[in-house]
Amino acid sequence: MAQSVPPGDIQTQPGTKIVFNAPYDDKHTYHIKVINSSARRIGYGIKTINMKRLGVDPPCGVLDPKEAVLLAVSCDAFAFGQEDTNNDRITVEWTNTPDGAAKQFRREWFQGDGMVRRKNLPIEYNP
């Protein structure tokens, strides 16, 4: 059963953080790549700390071994310097899909007793 095996590694490009550059009076979009470097199919979901400022498309999906997906991370216009951005980040969560499951994302994969891994990508705002 897939759930008894810990999920393998993923890679992200960029690997450690996302950087948005001023001006912030218009929406910015930054692309990141998520690569399933494990030998099993995984389901992934993306969470953001600040949902009114940050969005991710697609927010979830399924990746076969060695498959990659390009995600659009968008930052809506905001008043830079007047809002707290210190804790802004996106979090990639992933788990193995059950054996024989269709290649269609299901939220319940993350709600059972299977292991879920996380990778945080802090967001940096350049003035």
UniProtKB/Swiss-Prot annotation:
Coiled-coil blocks: none
Domain MSP: 9-126
Pfam families to which the protein is assigned, alphabetical: Motile_Sperm
Keywords: Acetylation, Cell projection, Cytoplasm, Cytoskeleton
Source taxon at top rank: Eukaryota
GO cellular component term of the entry, any: cytoskeleton
UniProt modified residues of type N-acetylalanine: A2
Cell inner membrane in keyword set: no
Tissue distribution of the protein: Sperm.
Compartments where found: Cell projection, Pseudopodium; Cytoplasm, Cytoskeleton
Function field: Central component in molecular interactions underlying sperm crawling. Forms an extensive filament system that extends from sperm villipoda, along the leading edge of the pseudopod.
Additional record remark: Around 30 MSP isoforms may exist in C.elegans.
Protein name: Major sperm protein 49
Gene responsible for this protein: msp-49
